[in-house]
């Protein structure tokens, strides 16, 4: 990538040869033209001075529930370490998948010489905490190939992507739609999709044959303490997580390789609990004033890490 000022680097990192990005309007290749991504049909997407580009068109596709405040509270929870075990599991799975990427590519004649470095996409990146941690992790491993991994992250929330892009770096941040991912077919080695909606048909399209999906979903005891408090207050019937639909959705498009469960319980003080309550979807449409929170002094974060391979 081109060196220079942060602004110039924030633009230059979107330059790929051959073209990586695909126009979401006409599906022609998007190439870097000064400070924009532009296709042959002149559809143009400007790159922000903060180092991200929005390829969304039309009205606001963002939910009012996922506003800037939501992502700022989520960032505070991540910074407190409540999700560190999930982040480690995610990074482990991505790193393991990248270790096999060169061998997988060598079996595909048309892609054998297409790219020197592996490519990872965080689909539904939010404010970018998982991708930032993955960026630091890959930069620290004793492997020149992994050090040069091409990192791309997108979310449908422009607010989230604006937060994610703060601080510069090599990650290519985009505001984009899962239903129309702006990447060309067969261009990605690994997709991370963490506590986020999925589009398995699109994932399969952009993954190379043998590419990997790391899908992370809540485990059965995820936020069990808070869910019990909600049930005890009579605001919901028993709240249970089932990942059967997720597994069926993945299996319809990919081959599931393995599933690992990670869990940790963290003590929470009043400030951390406030941040957590403001960022967990469990609290959507729940009146916090109706809850008895005086005895809620810990929260369990449990996740199932599902690794699947594109067929």
Q: Locations of the language-model features?
A:
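Conserved Class I S-adenosyl-L-methionine
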Residues: 18-19, 261-311
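N-terminal auxiliary segments of SAM/dcSAM-dependent transferases
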Residues: 2-64
